[in-house]
């Protein structure tokens, strides 16, 4: 049986966003589900926009999400190989030279659109005479090269979309080699997939027409194409998510929003599938339950608040031994099990635990809250003398209610504000033992 090999091929022209990390996750999960390999490839042939800092950031995001790769390479290291294939396809008459300028091509495109026609290249370059070509060369024009798409039906069985069919005549011959000699994504990707024996490719449905053309490229190289799966796009309200939209970068979710890796991995590996989106603590659990056939063909709506809720669900499920190392990573190794269990139910982000530590160990500033000082003084006097435990709050407030005739918010809220500086948070009955008696009295008086 053929070994499953998948790949993730980002362009290092920006940060990873939730759309392409979803593709990375599903390719990784599919490979691991079938005891296969996962390859990281950098599509860096766009010399002007590709940057080393983006490569480093992409690696950091993948490592954060525990998406370890078995091999990695970048396309710039394979230029001589691409040149070999260029010569082969020229000999096979599947590549042809074109001499139009970008301005001329844009005029053609606008003319076609004005006539209600699809902007498909008219293959004028195939009819150039030797004299015309020589004239272009004398003008200093350098050729770009297009791949000749056969005008025949292109069909494949998609892992998600089912049977897909394209008419070759409805596709425009893509530019695969630019006038400066650099190669575009389309052909390089196919050459890499052949050489690295990629068996399965899972990517967004915005690549479907590319897939139709690339299947012909595989055939032109006398190779079988991989099995493809095209994911429905992630949309936020009315906008497709991409790196140009911004605001959905994995680095932002990690560093600024403060979400856990397994919350992000759980959410985006299940989003758009028929499976219930629940937090998983380990990648092995996601691998075990992963089924590519469960993904829908319909667009998937991404609501950031859903991801944040999942992060909360993950945190409240973590025992202290499961979160201890993460606390060290955020410089909160001073948090012990008792404190963790007390504040855990109210944590939206792990960093919130540090905030609650500060609240319990540093007197909050409540000068601007206009609290009833007489009531707080009375509360301090009625604080039980016994050791402060989780039972203290109930005993204390019951006594206060009897003496002051206060109840509900009027009874509890001033105490919470005085003790924590916040209107909401962990149960005060659990927080109270974390604050020293002297500190409780100090905050009340």
Curated annotation (Swiss-Prot):
Reaction catalysed by this enzyme: tRNA(Glu) + L-glutamate + ATP = L-glutamyl-tRNA(Glu) + AMP + diphosphate
EC number: 6.1.1.17
Keyword ATP-binding: yes
Sequence motif 'KMSKS' region, location on chain: 240-244
One of the record's GO molecular function terms: tRNA binding
InterPro entries, per the entry: aa-tRNA-synth_I_cd-bd, aa-tRNA-synth_I_codon-bd_sub2, aa-tRNA-synth_I_CS, aa_tRNA-synth_I_cd-bd_sf, Glu-tRNA-ligase_bac/mito, Glu/Gln-tRNA-synth, Glu/Gln-tRNA-synth_Ib_cat-dom, GluQ/Sye
Uppermost EC category: ligase
GO BP annotations listed: glutamyl-tRNA aminoacylation
Signal sequence, start to end: none
Binding site for ATP: 243
Keyword field: Aminoacyl-tRNA synthetase, ATP-binding, Cytoplasm, Ligase, Nucleotide-binding, Protein biosynthesis
Xref: HAMAP family: Glu_tRNA_synth_type1
Family: Belongs to the class-I aminoacyl-tRNA synthetase family. Glutamate--tRNA ligase type 1 subfamily.
Name recorded for this polypeptide: Glutamate--tRNA ligase 1
Source organism of this protein record: Rickettsia bellii (strain OSU 85-389)
